[in-house]
Amino acid sequence: MAKISRLFGSTVKAAITAQAGFHGKRIPAVSSLQEHIVKSTPARYNSTQACLENDISGTDNKGFKGHDMLAPFTAGWQSTDVDPLIIEKSEGSHVYDMQGRKYIDTLAGLWCTALGGNEPRLVDAATKQLNTLPFYHSFWNRTTKPSLDLAKELLDMFTAKKMAKAFFTNSGSEANDTQVKLVWYYNNALGRPNKKKFIARAKAYHGSTLISASLTGLPALHQNFDLPAPFVLHTDCPHYWRYHLPGETEEEFSTRLAKNLEDLILKEGPETIAAFIAEPVMGAGGVIPPPATYFDKIQAVVKKYDILFIADEVICAFGRLGTMFGSDMYNIKPDLVTLAKALSSAYMPIGAVLVSPEVSDVIHSQSNKLGSFSHGFTYSGHPVACAVALEAIKIYKERNMVERVNRISPKFQEGLKAFSDSPIIGEIRGLGLILATEFANNKSPNDHFPPEWGVGAYFGAQCQKNGMLVRVAGDTIMMSPPFVVTPEELDELIRIYGKALRETEKRVEELKSQK
């Protein structure tokens, strides 16, 4: 083992700081095949870190080891023993560290800087609003014009199903917490006090606050936090490559998952199930596009039992998939919608909840009875955040960003999927400007590389060494470049990916020879 550990350089440590992979305890209501894989991942994650920890010896001490931040999604040893990668400047699709090194930011920050790192119109919008009205709240029927304008804009542009009201938050996590409170408020108003349970999916990501982390189907967000909350259930992840049965078609797979969902509803009692929440394409769980008819079948089930459908569009909205919203891509007709990230291109923290007339009318009536709708945040509808979001939406429309994504995404998708024949790649999946590579031994979803090899972390380190940042989660690599990425930058991205892959193939071959 020590011999294998020495094969890993200190650059791997920098790559694994981005990990928030698939690890943890059993998720309820997951099929036995999926359960086996979910339960097998904690050892993979932990032993990879243990192996890498043996070689924490960065050569260029920048003086920030043991810094003062309790860093999100970061292991303690990383903060104490490894200098963080400190990003100082951004331009377009690139970011620069404190030493002036330039990187292609293939994850657009965290799936969010859709307009790149230095869009002057967004800076100007923020500056103008700061000079006019830097803050005012939206409580007690007092508010600001940017928040009213943004609410109208969002309601007008979401066309998958008519929406009637918008509620503003500071993040996707807060927005999904709000969704739960709205649904409970709604069912209480209708005299259904027992209809309170939520169904999410294994490998889903819906946030990291108390309730949104419970909805999330990545057990690392539950472990030692006493989560998930008891009112949250999880059903199957729609990842066909990994979870289909032998000989099962995508259509049959989707039918089985819909049947499993219905069985779960019947087991719990339809009168207890309030809502189903789903990302159109799963993001942090590994970029998992569903089979073509999956959402049609799922929606039929939830509608049958009077269960609300919440579309978590935090990653997919505003063009990421090649449609303005992910709901447009998959014919989803949600009752509630969650937005954040690209809403402001991440230049200001802001999230939103869109509420259908059927739900908002009930909430309106109930708030009249109670004298108030007693939910909100100090910064709900912050005028600066709303002004920036309004300008971002103007840019998306004026520059035809959806059309642009459709124009450049074939180069991105086809250029990377051309590497699918690599002996260490199990699957490359994605659409639009979002993609994942999953490494697998013998190209099989059921044949993992030994966890101590850290194949994904090594690939990520090679990318970083060559001027590109990717997201590493176990042996899955995720990418979602800014919408403004150029064809030339995509050529460079593909070149670095290929170089990192060749180095990783060599490393895997070397490790196999040590067994």
From Swiss-Prot:
One of its GO terms (molecular function) is 4-aminobutyrate:pyruvate transaminase activity. InterPro entries: Aminotrans_3, Aminotrans_3_PPA_site, PyrdxlP-dep_Trfase, PyrdxlP-dep_Trfase_major, PyrdxlP-dep_Trfase_small. Gene3D superfamilies: Aspartate Aminotransferase, domain 1, Type I PLP-dependent aspartate aminotransferase-like (Major domain). GO terms for biological process: biotin biosynthetic process; gamma-aminobutyric acid metabolic process. Substrate binds at residues 205, 341. Pyridoxal 5'-phosphate binds at residues 172-173, 312. GO terms for cellular component: mitochondrion. Keywords: Aminotransferase, Mitochondrion, Pyridoxal phosphate, Transferase, Transit peptide. It comes from Solanum lycopersicum. Belongs to the class-III pyridoxal-phosphate-dependent aminotransferase family. This is Gamma aminobutyrate transaminase 1, mitochondrial. It catalyses: 4-aminobutanoate + pyruvate = succinate semialdehyde + L-alanine; 4-aminobutanoate + glyoxylate = succinate semialdehyde + glycine. It is found in: Mitochondrion.
